[in-house]
């Protein structure tokens, strides 16, 4: 059975999970002391100073930086990835991991079984023969057929992107390991994404996210100086690592997004590939626009799932009528998952703007309170708009009968897409 068919079977068998119902949101403002305390409380993630953050665009900036740091690893490498598929970058990374493994570095690799289940045995063997420990998160097997009530666990995936070298350097973002992520994101065959390289105290929390998933998968707790060294100040950026694991009843990234939107005074700029806001998020966005906040949303002109794209577009109407500007990126598939609020507060990570990310997947986001980084991301947003098409309410309202029918088919399962 194809892996997509597995998930459809799971959905039909066990039903769906949804985020918690938020009936009231506190009136906080970005930058005020109570804003930071409120964000920390609802995301269970401390906001920590002393970090160095480098924003990396697309594969042509991200993969060379990752490979450079991997090849310089001295003690440990931990790597968690949702999507790892055959191709030149997949082979190059596998060889780099294996080379470090042969040099005595401890290499722990965790791949999601749904997103990476089709990776070739050749690539896995390359890593294992180099001494790497390779595991698959929630391996899909025949157990769910024999015991159907156990199917539910397969619907909860690890969508996190984590790379930590020597416990001191970290990477996260929206990237996958595929040749689709190579290039500059301006041609159809090269997806557009945004990632980050991290040094400083925040790396410990990135490593903790990996340790959580590794423990669940293997029963092994990683630790010690090699994985969690003492981390000194590396820069002047303040931020947090927000991880969510909804199977534990937590929806931290949902609350991060919701509180950030509600706290905006001047501007909100959202870039996301899978955009299906619930009623609470939609209301928060429309209310922001109503109080004079400029709200711009950049979405893909096409994505790798037609039914998801159709379901996403069905949400445009209330937002457009509420005074929100929506754009669709045309140069390639837009896969970046970022938000910038008031030019000072920004987040980069794996979290899509949909129920699957908020309620079903393990996710991870880097959030920063830094004017320099936030303004860099606003400039990136402006550059992306040059390759995008604005969507008016009239254009959206005149969509074809076929699209409207597809929306009807997508509606019952949109919270699982």
Predicted feature locations:
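Hydrophobic helical h-region of N-terminal Sec-dependent signal peptides
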Residues: 8-12
């Amino acid at each position: 059975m194809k892996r997509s068919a597995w998930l459809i079977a799971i959905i039909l068998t066990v039903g769906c999970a949804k985020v918690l119902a938020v009936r009231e949101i506190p009136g906080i403002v970005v930058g005020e002391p109570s804003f930071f305390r409120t964000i920390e409380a609802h995301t269970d993630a401390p906001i920590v100073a002393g970090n160095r953050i480098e924003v990396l665009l697309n594969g042509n900036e991200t993969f060379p930086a990752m490979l450079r740091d991997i090849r310089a690893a001295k003690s440990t490498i931990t790597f968690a990835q949702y999507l790892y598929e055959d191709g030149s970058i997949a082979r190059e990374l596998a060889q780099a991991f294996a080379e470090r493994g042969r040099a005595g570095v401890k290499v722990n690799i965790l791949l999601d079984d749904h997103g990476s289940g089709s990776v070739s045995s050749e690539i896995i063997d390359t890593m294992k023969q180099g001494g790497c420990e390779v595991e698959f998160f929630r391996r899909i097997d025949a157990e769910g057929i024999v015991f159907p009530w156990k199917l539910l666990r397969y619907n909860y995936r690890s969508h996190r992107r984590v790379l930590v070298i020597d416990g001191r350097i970290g990477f996260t973002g929206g990237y996958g390991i595929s040749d689709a992520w190579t290039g500059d994101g301006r041609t159809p065959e090269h997806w557009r994404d945004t990632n980050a390289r991290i040094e400083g105290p925040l790396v410990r929390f990135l490593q903790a996210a990996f340790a959580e998933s590794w423990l669940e998968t293997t029963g092994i707790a990683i630790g010690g100086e090699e994985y969690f060294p003492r981390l000194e100040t590396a820069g002047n950026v303040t931020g947090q690592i927000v991880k969510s694991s909804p199977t534990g009843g937590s929806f931290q990234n949902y609350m991060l997004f919701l509180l950030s939107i509600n706290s905006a005074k001047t501007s909100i700029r959202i870039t996301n590939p899978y955009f299906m806001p619930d009623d609470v998020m939609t209301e928060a966005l429309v209310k922001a626009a109503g109080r004079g906040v400029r709200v711009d949303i950049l979405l893909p002109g096409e994505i790798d799932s037609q039914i998801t794209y159709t379901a996403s577009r069905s949400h445009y109407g209330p937002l457009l009528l509420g005074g929100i500007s929506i754009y669709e990126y045309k140069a390639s598939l837009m896969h970046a998952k970022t938000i910038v609020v008031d030019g000072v507060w920004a987040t980069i990570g794996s979290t899509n703007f949909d129920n699957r990310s908020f309620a079903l997947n393990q996710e991870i986001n880097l959030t920063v309170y830094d004017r320099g980084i936030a303004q860099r991301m606003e400039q990136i947003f402006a550059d992306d708009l040059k390759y995008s098409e604005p969507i008016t309410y009239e254009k959206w309202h005149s969509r074809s009968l076929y699209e409207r029918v597809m929306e009807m088919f997508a509606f019952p399962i949109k919270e699982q897409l």
